[in-house]
């Protein structure tokens, strides 16, 4: 089954290979047994339906909800807590068997662990329950019905009953019900943006215009929309075999794997488990050697294992991630999967789509050429750029022609909105010109009303121009305006307007035109030419009837007024965001379905290709040599066409990804986007992918973190993604990266803080076993630390600010969430000082009450025996069992208070890993509150009446709070000295051994 699935997945990753668009229509009809006039017969349709299956997407195998819930309940860190809980119940049962009057400490601890694991499991399941439902979102794109010609009759069928060979009919507003070969059409345009990323409407025809099935004009694809006109076509693929079906199957079949934070927690579990089991085994053996029974040794072993488990850590990590997710949502990054919060911080490469992510997703007039000069239009989102061109003599004429020679109109319901935010009836280029003209003139409709249109030749693909005839403002006659492909417009002109004067269009002026046209086209911009002509009043008097079908007016010998070029301009914040990525060690790769020239131009504008860095094409153009003669290694950047990528093997792609830091992939298919992501992952990189179309969904799913667009993104891309950018802005990703890296550092600090207290919690049990010392702290008291006083301070680390500017992405092999240096600091250094502080307090109180240290060592058996009701202390005073227990529980409380006090300083030193506390400051208000909070909780547990019976916590004399304070101060001084020496000697011994 696994091999079959793997084979199917590899087939889906292959480029689409079709010949149905290239072969003659008659041959296609013979192959499919159909007819271009009458379609299939009913019997043929039934046979084809059985052969090819229904026109529907096959749902992937899904995991039952109860299994998902069990995975959350028993996976990873939860398993460690389950084991701890079970061991507590076993220890309690053993103690109960040995002594029926045993206290229920282990029972309470087991129940507490059970509660923690069930609650965190339920929370994780709730988060996961909202995750990927990719196939459902594909099904939402399915048309409900389709019009089909069968037996020569037009009938309406359910879309899933359409089969290969059917002759289908579509019109404006219809969704294409399957992959079809166009047999006839009239002014048909389709929206392929969700499939190819091409935002412009694509015209359809019966002619094969490209070998690539995604770019030819005689195919229309399942799920895409008909925007204009009507058409008929023969179905060539249905359901899973359609282009969109292949993408759906590919996206739903991919396994995105474990997130970096999940792998880190798994690594942490291995460390903690190994240490706990090893330590427990060692002390079990020591217990035997000291003469303890196997039952006592087993209880000791279980106690040590449980004492090593950080019970509150899972809840702490979950809450930290949740808080960061909420913070990111306020910055327009909506997280669908909690673990993705940290994954974005681990990102070392971003594969970004162009349209709408790096750019504004609106065509805008970028440049103009008039009066023999190229001027830059204001493309800023708030119109704050340079507008000096408005004073030029040729500008008003160019704007007049652009305003009049257009069918585009603003939608009336958006009249109250700013010009750039209004919707337009018309295609993207028309909308760009209309908005630019509106902002330049104040009111295009006013110009049109004063110079009314009387006739029009609409734009068509054969002529490549549009003409309209208008009344003069003074009603004295007519004039015409024309726009279209620049070369077509120029050939119809005999004069040109320069600085308000009409001069002959000679060879010099044509050369100036060609230079400007090439320069604008080389910037990846769509260029249109504009011209006009004053119709003589004696030949075209008022009331003249203009014929648009057989023009009875001149459409040559016109006056050229200028060029306008349009582009979807970069977002204002993107260049700075790309620069920040670079400084943070993140490689940004553009992966787009757009044309290479346009992609390269935008890449240069946003900084993906740095200023002065050349591609092989640039070098070839500069040296005036063929591209084949350029050494690829001499180029600093690469622009790879999808057709070239198709012919590459994995090694060639890997070589490009390794060698170039600046890469643009253009004209890529969905499968190629996926192959690029897999190639980057082979380099050991963590990959973030951005996208908005259905075509992006496989790459979004495969990436370490998929980032979909919230505004322009399709439902499919959002379901495949881990994160959604609510403002569709690439700059928001950088914010997410900064937050992700910060939370990784802060979770690391939180773990360091949490683990440190395990040593003072564990050491009393070791002293109990090794030196027969009466127990200095109880299990319930430990629980009050792990699930009480330590939780809020640990969570407060999520609010800690960064120590420095965005750092380089971490090396997942070398930089772990928990490493040996963190363990060494928490357990071997700070934890040991805390244990000394706790025992110092313990001995002070015991000594003050009569038991000096030399009396306490070896006293355990008599201390715990109810038979001794007259145990003497160092001064000869006799102690009953009840009095001894009251003193013991008072010491437990004091040890607990001592841990809280030394944890004050531990929390403060964990704020930074390198900087001094005095450099970082105490600006984290939540952490400051946490210090007060844990102190209040400790005081509440100690002094609240009834706690002596519930938790065996006893009120302390006020001066018993002071013995641990010197140790707390010692920890602060020690750590400040360590960090000072680390900063003085970067990379030295201290940094290598203690910097975690």
Swiss-Prot record:
This is the catalytic component of the active enzyme, which catalyzes the hydrolysis of ATP coupled with the exchange of sodium and potassium ions across the plasma membrane. This action creates the electrochemical gradient of sodium and potassium ions, providing the energy for active transport of various nutrients. Keywords: ATP-binding, Cell membrane, Ion transport, Magnesium, Membrane, Metal-binding, Nucleotide-binding, Phosphoprotein, Potassium, Potassium transport, Sodium, Sodium transport, Sodium/potassium transport, Translocase, Transmembrane, Transmembrane helix, Transport. The keyword Flavoprotein does not apply. The sodium/potassium-transporting ATPase is composed of a catalytic alpha subunit, an auxiliary non-catalytic beta subunit and an additional regulatory subunit. The active site is at residue 353. One of its GO terms (cellular component) is plasma membrane. This is Sodium/potassium-transporting ATPase subunit alpha-A. InterPro entries: ATPase_P-typ_cation-transptr_C, ATPase_P-typ_cation-transptr_N, ATPase_P-typ_cyto_dom_N, ATPase_P-typ_P_site, ATPase_P-typ_TM_dom_sf, ATPase_P-typ_transduc_dom_A_sf, Cation_transp_ATPase_P-type, HAD-like_sf. Belongs to the cation transport ATPase (P-type) (TC 3.A.3) family. Type IIC subfamily. CDD domains: P-type_ATPase_Na-K_like (cd02608). It is an enzyme of class 7 (translocase). The lineage of its organism: Eukaryota, Metazoa, Ecdysozoa, Arthropoda, Crustacea. It comes from the Eukaryota. Mg(2+) binds at residues 692, 696. It comes from Artemia franciscana (Brine shrimp).
